Amino acid sequence: MSTETVKIETIGSGGDGVAATNEGAVFVPFTLPGETVAIARVKNHGTVMSWSETSPERVAPRCRHFGPEGKGGACGGCQLQHWADGPYHEYKRQLVVAALKAKGIETDVAPLFACQPGERRRVTMSLKLTDKGIVLGYMQAGTHHIVPVEECPIAMPAIVDKLPVIRKLGQVLGSGSQPFRVTVQATLSGLDIAFMDLRKPDARKRQTAIDLCLREKGLARLTLGDEILIEPEKPVVDFGGVMVSPPPGAFLQATMRAEQAMADLVLGHLKGAKRVVDLFAGCGTFSLRLARQSAVHAVEFDAPALGALDL
């Protein structure tokens, strides 16, 4: 490890600040273009020790778990909460511009469709049993450390409000010292909670988890892998007026507004098309909307997702 002072020139595609040095580029998380920082360097990775010049585009992060000063560690769920919206949005747009240009495609790229705090309806978190109880949160980048979260400002309140319940379920169903995961989706009928990477719990643990779900309002389904443990309400999402029940852990667009914006774009471009093939159709995000104006052939490798289209 060495120490040096560097000037951040840009933000790389992975979200880290990039500085040029005599030994090549070094990537420094939680920095911004124009900032001068003293870093501890290991190969091409730098950790900020202090700032001697900060960017006027730097803002206070919304989340108490974000960044090197984050509570419980630097949560790996977000990378750029410290950047003002305007330059951040343009950075994301330029990623698309660069990707197209690399393939020889020159075209206009629209401004970023910005999602707001509290809109994300789908999160995947990690859990681990410890001597002190259960830890629920996101992995710190480049480590196996789970940052225990008390809040998640990007997620819908329906998810954040149930974090204590998800912890309890993890405490009941978990075993051993290996981490496991949970995907939580907010649906119209309640939360769809899907645990993964778990050993099969015994009958007592299953019943305890079921009883907990029955006592809690707002829980639609609890699954272990592909096994439905309890389903008080069938999880339902709205794809353009068609109600669909996705399988456990199914892919959904992160926010409903972004999904609608994408669907409007697709529908507009394909208006007048008699036949459409929807590759990687998932649960029908686009297929079911397109079916109102065209004959659609939906293609999807995941059988449970495709089964959700069988209305």
Residue ranges and their predicted role:
Residues 40-42, 126-130, 185-187:
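Short beta-strand micro-motifs enriched in acidic
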Residues 2-9, 13, 172, 198-311:
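Rossmann-like S-adenosyl-L-methionine
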